[in-house]
């Protein structure tokens, strides 16, 4: 009898887990859970074990070629490159077939996204300009964590109009493109010509695979791995390799199959339920030990938080509103400016993407206090944006 009861309970638990992973908000919930666990560990008696785990040396060697990094660097440079493969595929799909495939569809979210990148950077600069050592952090509040933003929106999925969801997706995709450009232009250092040549050869190989509409995903994975390793060694940030790999995968194969859709389907679950939660676990572990009032009012924390809470909504809403009033773009049918403002506030959730940019802007040499304050600013700004965004979205969609 006890045995049967155990089996029944096991089946019930499995069904609950399956139901959870089918939720639209599952990815966002798992992200939040990972971040909370990281913060609890970082402020518990297990903090040393948590940090030691993240700093475990992990090596990869093939003949004379080797990559030696700590676990946290493998997560940030390796796993996040896989995430950017997905970003590259999503951008390509939307540009050729989706919400960004025509000028009329693309111009409104494009202008909004530009505002959402420029104004947060300006807000950051205005607050942090008194300290030249903080100049590198201007890109941190530019980012939007699309998984989290969509997770919050999914909580109200039944009352959120479809055009508003499409606007958020298009906005986030253009935002990702902006982040890619920023990483390429401002966070690549000490370039190696030899590694860049290897990277160029790998890119040519990917172009040929795409040109001949090769559908075998293993071919892209092998060449992509070579490209990632070459880019990593070149001094250009390795996540750019992910974007190039994503763009190289064909939308259609020779026999009408859809390689990009197949690979996107595989990576989407890994990204939502493994890669991003793991990144959050590795980077959200902020220790509050030794933090006083003076640190909380520091220019760095205020600049990042203000960029996310104020800069994002002002930039997105302001640019989109002006573009419509000047006749440069048209407000999508089925939504209003109050809902655009709610989405703009929601885009202040920088979380994992802002933390990723912070890890590039301030390395270990910047000092523990700088890294701690930047993460605190991101967590505070993202939390406030999530709460306000949810409340505004709930109110505006209810009114509609």
Swiss-Prot record:
A Gene Ontology BP annotation from the UniProt entry: regulation of pH
Superkingdom per UniProt: Bacteria
UniProt entry tagged with the keyword Transmembrane: yes
A Pfam family reported for this protein in Swiss-Prot or TrEMBL: Na_H_antiport_1
Lipid bilayer topology: Multi-pass membrane protein
Swiss-Prot/TrEMBL keywords: Antiport, Cell inner membrane, Cell membrane, Ion transport, Membrane, Sodium, Sodium transport, Transmembrane, Transmembrane helix, Transport
Lipid biosynthesis in keyword set: no
MF GO annotations: sodium:proton antiporter activity
Subcellular localization, as worded in the UniProt entry: Cell inner membrane
Catalytic activity: Na(+)(in) + 2 H(+)(out) = Na(+)(out) + 2 H(+)(in)
Any single Gene Ontology cellular-component annotation: plasma membrane
Transmembrane portions of the chain: 26-46, 71-91, 107-127, 137-157, 166-186, 189-209, 212-232, 233-253, 273-293, 299-319, 340-360, 373-393
Classification via HAMAP family: NhaA
UniProt similarity note: Belongs to the NhaA Na(+)/H(+) (TC 2.A.33) antiporter family.
Job description of the protein: Na(+)/H(+) antiporter that extrudes sodium in exchange for external protons.
PANTHER family attached to this UniProt entry: NA(+)_H(+) ANTIPORTER NHAA, SODIUM ION/PROTON ANTIPORTER NHAA-RELATED
Name this protein carries in UniProt: Na(+)/H(+) antiporter NhaA
Organism: Haemophilus influenzae (strain PittEE)
């Amino acid at each position: 009898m006890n045995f049967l009861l155990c089996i029944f309970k096991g089946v019930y638990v499995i069904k609950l887990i399956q139901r959870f992973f089918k939720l639209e908000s599952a990815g966002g919930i798992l992200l939040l859970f990972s971040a909370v666990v990281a913060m609890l560990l970082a402020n518990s008696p297990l903090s040393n074990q948590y940090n030691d785990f993240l700093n475990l040396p992990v090596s990869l060697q093939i003949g004379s070629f080797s990559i030696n990094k700590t676990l946290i660097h493998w997560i940030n440079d390796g796993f996040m490159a896989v995430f950017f493969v997905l970003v590259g595929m999503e951008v390509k799909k939307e540009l050729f077939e989706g919400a960004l495939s025509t000028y009329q569809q693309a111009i409104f979210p494009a202008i909004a996204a530009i505002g959402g990148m420029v104004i947060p950077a300006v807000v950051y600069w205005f607050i942090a300009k008194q300290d030249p050592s903080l100049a590198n952090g201007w890109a941190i509040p530019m980012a939007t964590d699309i998984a989290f933003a969509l997770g919050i929106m999914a909580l109200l999925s039944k009352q959120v109009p479809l055009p508003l969801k499409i606007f958020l997706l298009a906005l986030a995709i253009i935002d990702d493109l902006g982040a890619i450009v920023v990483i390429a232009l401002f966070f690549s250092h000490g370039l190696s010509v030899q590694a860049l040549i290897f990277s160029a050869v790998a890119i040519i190989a990917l172009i040929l695979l795409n040109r001949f509409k090769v559908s075998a995903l293993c071919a892209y994975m092998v060449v992509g791995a070579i490209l990632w390793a070459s880019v990593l060694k070149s001094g250009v940030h390795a996540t750019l390799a992910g974007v190039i790999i994503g763009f190289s995968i064909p939308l259609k194969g020779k026999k009408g199959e859809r390689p990009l859709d197949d690979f996107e389907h595989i990576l989407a679950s890994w990204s939502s339920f493994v890669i991003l939660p793991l990144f959050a676990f590795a980077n959200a572990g902020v220790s509050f030990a030794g933090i006083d009032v003076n640190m909380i009012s520091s220019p760095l924390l205020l600049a990042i938080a203000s960029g996310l809470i104020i800069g994002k909504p002002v930039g997105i809403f302001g640019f989109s509103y002006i573009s419509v009033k000047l006749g440069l773009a048209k407000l999508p049918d089925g939504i209003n400016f109050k809902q655009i403002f709610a989405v703009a506030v929601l885009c202040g959730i920088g979380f994992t993407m802002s933390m990723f940019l912070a890890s590039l802007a301030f390395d270990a040499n910047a000092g523990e206090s700088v890294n701690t304050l930047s993460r605190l600013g991101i967590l505070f700004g993202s939390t406030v944006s999530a709460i306000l965004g949810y409340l505004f979205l709930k109110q505006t969609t209810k009114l509609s």
